[in-house]
Amino acid sequence: MGQKINPHGFRLGITTDWKSRWYADKQYAEYVKEDVAIRKLLATGMERAGIAKVEIERTRDRVRVDIHTARPGIVIGRRGAEADRIRSELEKLTGKQVQLNILEVKNAEAEAQLVAQGVAEQLSNRVAFRRAMRKAIQSAMRQPNVKGIRVQCSGRLGGAEMSRSEFYREGRVPLHTLRADIDYGLYEAKTTFGRIGVKVWIYKGDIVGGKRELAANTAAPAGDRPRRERPSRPRRSGATGTTATSTEAGRAATATADAPATEQNQEG
């Protein structure tokens, strides 16, 4: 099941949080429809901004929208003109006062949505899909918090008549482990042969007790580990591995081996 389901939905309430935070009783369907419209509005015309995710939080008379982007200058615009335009359109859509927060993504190579968007842009520019996938994997694995990545492309790859799927993976990507912090991104590339779907999974370590544990940081250096002494084992005989003193033949062999030493001591 972990191979098929969306990693964010699979871990909701365990290691991931909701991207829409509000409560509604009879207006639930209306709010869900508004959230979809808000995200669609921010996605159209903002392809170059590199939007990683959009978080929506509602109160009784206000809607707060947090835009996580790799290029905040494009979203803000010259002297804030683009941000004002987005805010006015959101207020017209929701009918409430909108608080718009634009947050910069520091590490774009470690965000699955931005990696998928970068691969899709290269496919639209006629770059070979294998080269684009390998380049994205190499850039992501150079980041210190990335422990594994998987990139998959599906569609008419290379202009082939029959569509297929290919993926490359490096490092660990434990999709079925609930404590694993897995970032997931999906983007579609529009090519002359049709659309090609790009999916990216990025593993960033385990989350235990609300804290991320990285294997590289938790492992102790080899020189600092205390050495354990191996407990002494009884002498074994034969290919069967039986203890020498546990059989009649073993006891007889032991008595025969000890006899010459006893006789020498008596003669001395």
From Swiss-Prot:
Disulfide bonding pattern of the chain: none
Q: Sorted alphabetically, which PROSITE patterns does this protein's record hold?
A: KH_TYPE_2, RIBOSOMAL_S3
For whether the record's keyword set contains Ribosomal protein, the answer is yes
- List the transmembrane segments: none
Taken from the UniProt entry, a GO cellular component term is: cytosolic small ribosomal subunit
Similarity comment? Belongs to the universal ribosomal protein uS3 family.
One Gene Ontology biological process: translation
What superkingdom heads the lineage?
A: Bacteria
Q: What is the lineage of its organism?
A: Bacteria, Bacillati, Actinomycetota, Actinomycetes, Mycobacteriales
Q: Which residues form the KH type-2 domain?
A: 38-106
This chain's protein is named Small ribosomal subunit protein uS3
Subunit-structure text: Part of the 30S ribosomal subunit. Forms a tight complex with proteins S10 and S14.
- Gene behind this chain? rpsC
Bias category Low complexity: which stretches?
237-268
**What SMART domains would the database entry show?**
KH
The record's GO molecular-function terms, alphabetically, read:
mRNA binding; rRNA binding; structural constituent of ribosome
Assigned keywords, A-Z: Ribonucleoprotein, Ribosomal protein, RNA-binding, rRNA-binding
Provide the residue span(s) of the region labelled Disordered. Answer: 217-268
Q: What does this protein do?
A: Binds the lower part of the 30S subunit head. Binds mRNA in the 70S ribosome, positioning it for translation.
